[in-house]
């Protein structure tokens, strides 16, 4: 029996495994999927999770709950030795384990791209995982509670200052959603005003949303600025140490919440720990039919798709173009990969990946959005509805579609839930505190400890000396 190993349970990996279960006959192949989590995260919904418009668990699809004929292993693939048909996996107990296979499917996805900027490691939160979206929401909600206790001034404004680094879809969407959340929360905090909010979007390029054309991109900039946001284009963050943002323009300001959404980096298992061919960006070289290799040098029994693969875009007007790493492509590549794998096992012809874009749509907060399909551009409320309609259809399984719809309906009727869940991160705190709800996890009262951003000004602090290499 053919042993198929799928590395990664994101869009491409999940849909490939799901498709194989539907198409393979009994006893035709033994499929194993390895992923650090027991679920697939529908990442386009993470900005709305961060803003409290969607419940965190509703954007997660259980792998074991839907892949009944696939062996699911909770672990991190650390290396792939295709010459010997083995992969090394570090399971949840920390022990390394070798898995033998006949055919491998590499769908490990990408990681957040970082840079050696002082303070990023200590201050920033990414947005590729549900845990990060929940942490962003909790930090902003908690900041409102703390700010309401302070008099108007620098301290209050610093707590309610949000900086998002990255002007792609993830960065712009979470920026718009958090701006919408913060503005709506002012109704529940009469002590605060719109002047206390300070939102900054920073991108090194001269424009945002590179997936849309210039004029829609400029419209988004104008729209966000009208809502009181500050956009710093053609600008880089040179330091985020000690809760203070310093920009390449020389501007600096105190910051409360820093979100890093500056694009994707190659997955380490693909970039550095495999004998499969990779390109200069650390992506697996893939043919149009999703086999690993090139037309001149195919690699037998190896397939790849999704964000960790350089998949040729046959629909692009530019020769040699690669498919954009997004959910739309990853889902369709995963479905085709399952079809091609089964066809290859049965000695039939495989098909090239050819997908014409259905358009580009982004949320900018409740009631705000933008959609573009070729020359057609729709903005505002209709585009926001299109965003929700498209993604509720795209999220896998009817169970998840219904749950998301119900949450949206309840939010329309009752408004967004603004209760932070930060105490969930310290489940034993109340037990150790002996009934004092304000005691910390060690039983100590937080009033005796400085809050994360109650820090001295830069001239009173030593320079940061440890910087992490770019990932």
Report residues per predicted region.
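Short hydrophobic core segments
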Residues: 7, 99-109, 237, 253-263, ...
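Short glycine-rich anion-binding loops that position phosphate/pyrophosphate groups of nucleotides
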Residues: 12, 109-112, 175, 264-266
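A Rossmann-like FAD-binding core segment of flavoenzymes
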Residues: 30, 70-86, 179-294, 350
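FAD-site-proximal beta/loop scaffold in flavoenzymes
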Residues: 122-152, 243-245, 252-332
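Rossmann-like dinucleotide-binding core of oxidoreductases
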Residues: 156-212, 219, 230-232, 323-343, ...
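C-terminal, flexible cofactor-proximal segment of oxidoreductases
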Residues: 329, 333-471
């Amino acid at each position: 029996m053919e042993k198929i190993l799928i590395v990664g349970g994101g869009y491409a990996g999940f849909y490939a495994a799901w498709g194989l279960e539907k198409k393979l006959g009994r006893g035709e192949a033994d499929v194993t999927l390895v992923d650090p989590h027991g679920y697939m995260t529908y990442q386009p919904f993470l900005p709305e999770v961060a803003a409290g418009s969607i419940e965190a668990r509703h954007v997660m699809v259980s792998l074991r709950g839907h892949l009944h004929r696939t062996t699911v292993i909770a672990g991190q693939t650390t290396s792939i030795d295709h010459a010997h048909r083995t992969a090394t996996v570090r399971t949840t107990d920390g022990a390394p384990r070798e898995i033998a296979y006949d055919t491998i499917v590499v769908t490990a996805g990408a990681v957040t791209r970082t840079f050696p900027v002082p303070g990023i490691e200590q201050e920033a939160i990414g947005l590729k995982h549900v845990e990060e979206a929940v942490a962003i929401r909790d930090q902003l909600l908690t900041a409102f509670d703390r700010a309401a206790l302070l008099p108007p001034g620098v301290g209050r404004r610093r707590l309610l200052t949000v900086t998002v680094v990255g002007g792609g879809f993830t960065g712009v969407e979470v920026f718009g959603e958090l701006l919408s959340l913060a503005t709506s929360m002012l109704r529940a905090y009469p002590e605060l005003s719109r002047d206390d909010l300070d939102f900054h979007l920073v991108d090194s390029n001269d424009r945002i949303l590179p997936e849309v054309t210039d004029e829609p991109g400029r419209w988004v900039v104008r729209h966000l600025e009208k809502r009181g946001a500050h956009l710093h284009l053609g600008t880089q963050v040179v330091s985020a140490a000690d809760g203070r943002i310093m920009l390449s323009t020389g501007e600096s300001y105190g910051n409360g919440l820093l979100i890093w959404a500056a694009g994707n980096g190659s997955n380490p298992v693909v970039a550095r720990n495999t004998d499969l061919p990779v390109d200069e960006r650390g992506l697996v070289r893939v043919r149009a039919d999703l086999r690993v290799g090139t037309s001149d040098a195919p690699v037998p029994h190896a397939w790849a798709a999704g964000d960790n693969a350089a998949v040729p875009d046959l629909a692009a007007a530019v020769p040699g173009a690669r498919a954009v790493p997004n959910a739309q492509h990853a889902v369709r590549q995963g479905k085709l990969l399952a079809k091609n794998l089964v066809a290859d096992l049965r000695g039939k012809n495989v098909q090239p990946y050819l997908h014409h874009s259905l358009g580009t749509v982004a949320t900018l907060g409740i009631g705000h959005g933008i959609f573009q399909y070729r020359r057609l551009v729709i903005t505002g409320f209709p585009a926001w509805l299109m965003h929700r309609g498209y993604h509720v259809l795209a999220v896998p399984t009817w169970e998840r579609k219904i749950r998301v719809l119900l949450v949206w309906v309840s939010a329309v009727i009752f408004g967004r839930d603004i209760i932070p869940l930060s105490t969930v991160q310290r489940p034993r705190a109340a037990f150790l505190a002996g009934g004092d709800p304000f005691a910390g996890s060690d039983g100590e009262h937080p009033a005796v400890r400085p809050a994360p951003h109650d820090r001295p000004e830069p001239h009173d602090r030593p320079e940061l000396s440890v910087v992490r290499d770019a990932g």
